[in-house]
């Protein structure tokens, strides 16, 4: 890569999007890390910890689902920058207030509001980066954003170990407000501004559903990511419960999140560079879905003896589902400029929202099976759906993004 390409790759939109996603991941995963100490401080019994945790993560995920639609439409109607400013302000303030809650219901309300705010960050950032970089660098740019962003999980774990859970939320909110100031120097996407001048219909959410070819691609984009949030939302979030079922003591959710996200960041680097090398998004995703199946089975049934061995399993879980950046890039590349933000923002949040039915399915199966068997059935289900969904999307590696979605 020559010096000109490197300069384009490390441009202000890419750096700001990467730092924004870093704070977004910190705030998004902080709940998984501080779930047990925060609920304990509110008087929740250990026997209720899993059920109350599922209630709170559902509230956050429903917020993400709703926020994905709101911010996605806004990104196409008002511009990518409006989302980058509005979303970070909402989730930063929500997280600061979250540090003051005293009841589980207050906690749920704040996770819901924070979820709405968190929904806008990644889609708007990836859309802006995809439209700002030349085709040959697009995959590298989105990979850089995701890899830097995912390391926010490492910071969240460090902060949660160093401070109490309330201060961890205050710090997350403060980081977001600081980042808000840095966004003043970012310019709007040139591709979007050209479309805005043309006066075409933009951000029409229903356009994703009114033609079979678009709807098919939209559903395919969502469902290829199903294993990613099954791993994060169930296997990692409830890792202390899985470790207990395996007879392993001393597993801390924060460490499980950290190691899985280090794996996820490594996977994103590998999948990003692999897709550039083989010049195919779909072939790379196929390989990583296959790896996910192997690592999910190993995590649940490998005879781990120690917590360090268990954390190694968490790392490989993350590595297997390390096609998150590719997943969001594919969503951005499938659709025209007038629908790109809507698609790229709703797709990752719809898949995050899939944690809601997946946790219900997991809970239902736990009533008649043990926790490991229930998790394996849900996991195999997500893998099968993802393989099928891969057939519904286009190969977009070399696609020029300067085009529109039209109904006529």
Predicted features along the sequence, with ranges:
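Extracytoplasmic gate region of multi-pass secondary transporters
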Residues: 32, 214-265, 355, 359
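Extracellular/periplasmic helix-loop-helix junction of adjacent transmembrane segments
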Residues: 34-66
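Conserved MFS/SLC helix-loop-helix module at the cytosolic interface between two early adjacent transmembrane helices
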Residues: 66-102
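Helix-to-loop junctions at the C-terminal end of transmembrane segments
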Residues: 68-79, 268-280
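Cytoplasmic membrane-interface "Motif A"-like loop-to-helix N-cap segments
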Residues: 77-87, 136, 277-289
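Helix-breaking motifs and short loop linkers at transmembrane-helix boundaries and internal kinks
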Residues: 79, 100-106, 134, 279, ...
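C-terminal ends and interior cores of transmembrane alpha-helices
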Residues: 89-102, 290-304
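Helix-loop-helix hairpin linking two adjacent transmembrane segments in secondary transporters
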Residues: 145-184
């Amino acid at each position: 890569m020559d010096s000109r390409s490197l300069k384009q790759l490390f441009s202000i939109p890419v750096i700001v999007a990467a730092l924004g996603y870093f704070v977004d991941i910190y705030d998004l995963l902080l709940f998984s890390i501080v779930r047990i100490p925060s609920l304990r401080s509110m008087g929740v019994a250990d026997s209720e910890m899993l059920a109350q945790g599922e209630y709170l993560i559902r509230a956050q995920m429903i917020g993400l689902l709703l926020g994905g639609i709101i911010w996605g439409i806004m990104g196409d109607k008002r511009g990518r920058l409006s989302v980058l400013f509005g979303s970070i302000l909402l989730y930063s303030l929500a997280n600061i207030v979250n540090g003051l809650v005293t009841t589980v219901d207050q906690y749920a309300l704040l996770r819901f509001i924070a979820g709405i705010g968190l929904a806008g960050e990644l889609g708007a950032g990836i859309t802006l980066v995809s439209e700002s970089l030349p085709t040959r660098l697009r995959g590298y740019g989105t990979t850089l954003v995701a890899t830097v962003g995912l390391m926010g999980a490492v910071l969240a774990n460090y902060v949660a170990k160093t401070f109490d859970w309330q201060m961890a939320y205050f710090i997350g909110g403060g980081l977001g407000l600081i980042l808000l100031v840095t966004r003043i120097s970012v310019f709007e996407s040139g591709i979007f501004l050209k479309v805005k001048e043309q006066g075409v219909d933009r951000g029409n959410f229903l356009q994703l559903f009114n033609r079979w070819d678009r709807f098919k691609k939209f559903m395919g984009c969502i469902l290829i990511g199903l294993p990613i949030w099954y791993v994060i939302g169930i296997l990692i979030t409830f890792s202390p419960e899985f470790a207990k079922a395996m007879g392993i003591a001393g597993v801390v959710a924060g460490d499980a999140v950290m190691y899985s996200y280090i794996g996820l960041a490594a996977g994103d680097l590998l999948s990003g560079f692999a897709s550039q090398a083989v010049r195919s998004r779909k072939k790379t995703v196929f390989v990583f879905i296959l790896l996910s199946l192997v690592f999910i089975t190993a995590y649940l049934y490998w005879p781990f003896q120690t917590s360090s061995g268990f954390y190694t399993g968490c790392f490989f879980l993350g590595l297997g589902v390390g096609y998150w950046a590719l997943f969001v890039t594919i969503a951005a590349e499938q659709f025209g400029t007038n629908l790109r933000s809507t698609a790229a923002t709703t797709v990752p949040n719809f898949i995050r929202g899939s944690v809601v039915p997946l946790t219900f399915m997991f809970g239902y199966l736990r009533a008649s099976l043990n926790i490991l068997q229930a998790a394996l059935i849900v996991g195999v289900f997500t893998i099968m759906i993802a393989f099928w969904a891969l057939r519904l999307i286009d190969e977009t590696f070399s696609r020029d993004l300067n085009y529109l979605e039209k109904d006529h």
